């Protein structure tokens, strides 16, 4: 056979299978386009900061992984549907070598359309994506539509490698099976499946374990360490329940003769048993992808929309100055510098918060705070301990509290009361004179990444003694230990004026302190100065969430489409059989529709259940980013679920029409 004949056959096959190949090529084009655009952002000369480029580089790595998985997965639908066609070619005299040449030409055509189409769209839509990213980051980007040659070459090489691997996989599938097996390759799953009780039970246990971990997670650090394990349990449990659990439930319904031998239940249950065997993995994939979309979009939207709340939590005052290894002369000098700059800019300091403190880290065991300077505890009882002299507390709160030796006032950011009369710092005992319900030092918030316990002591002497006893055991160098053993001076305040004015004042204070107090380790952080870095981080995360969320959504849509097409071809014979045994068209349509509805909406329902179960642990993870506005996260999650459910329903209705065209 000549090369022209192979080419004609390949083109004819692509035309005849356009219902399955066009969506596949569109998915490939989309993957190439998204990869090229993000690659340009990560590597191009485009005015983006190093931090943003780092996030884009990480995102590009994720796109590489998901592109391989999704293209191989969608290809499996294509090759399954074409096995019968290839088997006919084989029986009619085409050797497997000839079939391989034909498939190779098809792969070349598909690859070039996908890669060049994707790169072209990447160049066209790249400018729009840069503008969107610039808007999210709150800075102007000088956009030039240029072809990034290194990115183009990398994109071409990467996706060409994927298509070569897919071709080799398809050729292997054809090579290892006989012509008869090829003819019946798309009819797999017609035998009634056996009940795999062990897999169903293991799936239920794994899912329950994942849910339990999500519900019992303590503080955010605890959530960080356990979240991955919970995700693995839920993913494996989902596959187990879809593959074995669904069939087990249906078989139980089948054994219930009173329920099963009703006309509307008989056909539905029988049909569902067969459907679940061939659809279980695909439905589990839809469920997991849907869960990923819902969580990714809702969390990144929440972080971006709630950015002002996050900044307020991270920086309670507009400007915060800390001096380590402080002394009275340095404190006076720093305070004078701050006052001069504020007066110079015609503004005024408000809500001032000035005090000295010593800081420790430990964990609470009963009424004993066990301190260790070289460990950062991540269990539910971990806490940061801040020791403050009584004089500073009285000045800050405008009170006149008194304390005897060995007495303390206690304030915790946790809403739960300490409720004991004594507290030990290692082996040093203190009597709790009063536990404070509120304080200007901080606010009650259970979602802080690390709970803070404030202890107000009679004066600086017991504080310095505790610091010395604790940090003498530290393995850190002498200079670091000396800094930790000393008191820290903290001065924070708000200002009147515009954001630009506040930013200038903060920058001037930072510059003046570095120039005029160089001998002291001094840090200055400002709400307005750090706002740009917040926009970069959360804007980039929001862009990544929406970008990857869109990709996962498109893959979900594609899987639903292929499922509907596969269901249509599989149900074509069933449709005729049900009519031949006496059911009219309306009854047949109603029976099949009920099965299809159950099949395709089960993943959405399970995804929503997964999100609800993960809600608590996700709020703990968001607290790591200082996002403690739970109401906002609830609103973002509900809005995301509603939008996704609407899109899911629209996709189902559109693909359902194609299903009925095939069946009829």
Q: What are these language model-derived features?
A:
Residues 228, 232-252, 309-335, 624-663:
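Alpha-helical transmembrane segments and their immediate juxtamembrane interface regions
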Residues 19-45, 51-87, 107-121, 201, ...:
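Hydrophobic alpha-helical transmembrane segments of multi-pass inner-membrane transport and secretion
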Residues 40-50, 119-152, 208-226, 603-664:
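Short helix-loop junctions at transmembrane helix boundaries
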Residues 3-5, 176-190, 569, 660-664:
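Short cytosolic juxtamembrane segments of multi-pass membrane proteins
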Residues 310-324, 329-554:
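Basic-flanked hydrophobic alpha-helices used for secretion and membrane insertion
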């Amino acid at each position: 056979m000549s090369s022209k004949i192979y080419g004609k056959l390949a083109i004819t096959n692509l035309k005849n299978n356009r219902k399955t190949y066009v969506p596949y090529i569109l998915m490939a084009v989309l993957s190439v386009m998204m990869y090229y655009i993000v690659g340009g952002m990560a590597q191009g000369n485009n005015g983006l900061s190093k931090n943003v480029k780092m996030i884009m580089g990480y995102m590009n790595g994720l796109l590489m992984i998901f592109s391989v998985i999704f293209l191989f997965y969608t290809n499996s639908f294509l090759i399954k549907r074409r096995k019968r066609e290839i088997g006919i070619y084989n029986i009619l005299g085409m050797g497997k070598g000839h079939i391989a040449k034909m498939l190779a030409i098809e792969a070349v055509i598909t690859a070039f359309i996908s890669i060049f189409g994707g790169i072209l769209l990447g160049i066209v839509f790249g400018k729009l994506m840069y503008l969107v990213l610039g808007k999210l980051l709150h800075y102007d980007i000088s956009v030039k539509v240029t072809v990034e040659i290194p990115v183009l070459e990398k994109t071409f090489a990467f996706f060409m490698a994927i298509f070569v691997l897919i071709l080799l996989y398809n050729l292997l599938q054809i090579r290892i099976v006989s012509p008869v097996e090829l003819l019946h390759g798309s009819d797999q799953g017609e035998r009634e499946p056996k009940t795999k009780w062990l897999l169903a039970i293991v799936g239920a246990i794994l899912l329950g374990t994942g849910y339990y971990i999500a519900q019992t997670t303590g503080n955010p650090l605890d959530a960080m360490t356990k979240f991955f394990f919970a995700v693995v349990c839920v993913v494996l449990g989902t596959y187990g329940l879809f593959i074995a659990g669904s069939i087990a439930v249906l078989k139980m319904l089948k054994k219930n003769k009173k329920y099963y031998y009703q006309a509307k239940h008989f056909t539905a249950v029988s049909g569902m048993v067969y459907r679940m065997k061939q659809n279980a993995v695909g439905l589990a994939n839809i469920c997991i992808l849907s869960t990923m979309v819902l969580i990714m979009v809702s969390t990144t939207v929440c972080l971006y929309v709630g950015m002002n709340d996050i900044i307020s939590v991270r920086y309670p005052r507009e400007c915060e100055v800390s001096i380590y290894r402080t002394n009275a002369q340095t404190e006076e000098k720093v305070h004078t510098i701050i006052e001069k700059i504020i007066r110079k800019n015609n503004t005024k300091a408000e809500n001032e918060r000035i005090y000295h403190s010593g800081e420790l880290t430990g964990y609470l065991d009963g009424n004993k705070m066990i301190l260790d300077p070289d460990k950062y505890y991540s269990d539910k009882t971990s806490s940061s301990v801040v020791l403050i002299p009584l004089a500073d507390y009285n000045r800050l709160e405008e009170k006149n509290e008194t304390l005897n030796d060995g007495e303390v006032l206690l304030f915790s950011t946790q809403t739960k009361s300490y409720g004991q009369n004594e507290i030990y710092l290692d082996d040093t005992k203190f009597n709790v004179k009063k536990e404070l319900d509120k304080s200007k030092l901080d606010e009650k918030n259970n979602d802080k990444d690390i709970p803070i316990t404030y202890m107000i002591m009679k004066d600086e002497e017991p504080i310095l003694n505790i610091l010395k006893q604790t940090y003498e055991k530290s393995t850190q160098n002498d200079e670091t230990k000396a800094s930790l053993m000393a008191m820290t001076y903290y001065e924070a305040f708000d200002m009147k004026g515009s954001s630009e004015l506040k930013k200038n004042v903060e920058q001037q204070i930072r510059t003046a302190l570095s120039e005029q107090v160089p001998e002291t380790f001094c840090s200055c952080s400002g709400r307005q100065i750090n706002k740009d870095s917040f926009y970069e981080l959360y804007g980039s995360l929001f862009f990544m969430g929406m970008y990857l969320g869109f990709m996962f959504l498109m893959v979900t849509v594609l899987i639903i489409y292929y499922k509907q097409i596969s269901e249509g071809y599989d149900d074509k014979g069933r449709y005729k059989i049900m009519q031949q045994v006496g059911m009219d068209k309306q009854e047949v349509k109603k029976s099949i529709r009920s099965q299809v509805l159950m099949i395709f909406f089960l993943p959405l329902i399970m995804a929503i259940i997964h999100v609800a179960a993960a809600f608590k642990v996700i709020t703990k993870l968001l607290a790591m980013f200082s996002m403690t506005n739970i109401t906002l996260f609830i609103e973002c999650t509900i809005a995301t679920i509603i939008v996704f459910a609407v899109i899911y329903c629209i996709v189902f209705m559109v693909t359902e029409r194609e299903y009925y065209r095939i069946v009829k």
